[in-house]
């Protein structure tokens, strides 16, 4: 399944002044299966969800790396020391991704991986995303997207097998393994779960293959 939803959720407190405009916490890090899962950041034997959230924060803030959210539905929830203010006509939040222009083509776009962003105000002031109202930031394709979309991934019997997915639109397929990335694609700190289900917004299939390779990577 090539189309992804990369969700980043932001939990914002009420502060009298801005200590830092950059997120300072990773509350949840739950990637869907994928080729860079367990690598960005690296999972090591014994790492649980809390350890992986700490590694995700370190990767993004201290080392300047990207983290993998896997296939559709994977997400990370981060917290800020300041409130994200909606200023009309201004960009209120900046998120850096790994989109780039292909060196083999003059066409701009390259490896573009759009995502969905949701924000919430920590109205109960407990620092965790419970009982707060979440708002999806409407991007350019909001009206063309499938809302209330759902995908379930089924853990295979072997980490060497492709991972089956099924959605609530009657579609199914596989997250295929690649020879370039041989580690387990299932999040290993979630190895006790036989199924991972994600819900959210599915962006439309706008990507166009303008390459010349017979078997594009």
Q: In which residue ranges do the predicted regions lie?
A:
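Sec-dependent N-terminal signal peptides
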Residues: 4-14
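A domain-level signal for the mature, folded cores of soluble proteins
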Residues: 19-115, 133-217
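Beta-propeller blade signature
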Residues: 118-120
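Acidic carboxylate motifs that coordinate Ca2+ or other divalent cations, activating on Asp/Glu
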Residues: 122, 126
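Generic structural signal for well-ordered beta-strand positions
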Residues: 128-130
């Amino acid at each position: 399944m090539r189309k992804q939803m990369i969700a980043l959720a932001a939990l914002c407190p009420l502060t009298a002044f801005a200590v830092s405009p950059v997120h300072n916490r990773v509350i949840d890090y739950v990637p869907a299966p994928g080729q860079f899962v367990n690598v960005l950041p690296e999972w090591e034997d014994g790492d649980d969800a809390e350890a992986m959230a700490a590694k995700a924060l370190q990767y993004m803030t201290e080392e300047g790396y990207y983290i993998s959210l896997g296939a559709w539905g994977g997400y990370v929830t981060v917290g800020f020391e300041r409130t994200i203010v909606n200023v009309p006509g201004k960009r209120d939040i900046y998120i850096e991704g790994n989109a780039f222009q292909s060196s083999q083509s003059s066409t701009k776009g390259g490896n573009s991986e759009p995502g969905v962003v949701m924000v919430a105000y920590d109205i109960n002031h407990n620092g965790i995303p419970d009982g707060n109202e979440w708002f999806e930031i409407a991007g350019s394709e909001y009206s063309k997207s499938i809302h209330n979309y759902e995908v379930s991934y089924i853990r295979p019997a072997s980490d060497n097998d492709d991972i089956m997915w099924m959605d609530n639109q009657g579609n199914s397929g596989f997250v295929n393994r690649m020879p370039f990335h041989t580690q387990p694609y299932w999040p290993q700190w979630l190895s006790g779960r036989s199924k991972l289900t994600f819900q959210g917004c599915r962006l439309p299939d706008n990507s166009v293959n303008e390459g010349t390779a017979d078997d594009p990577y």
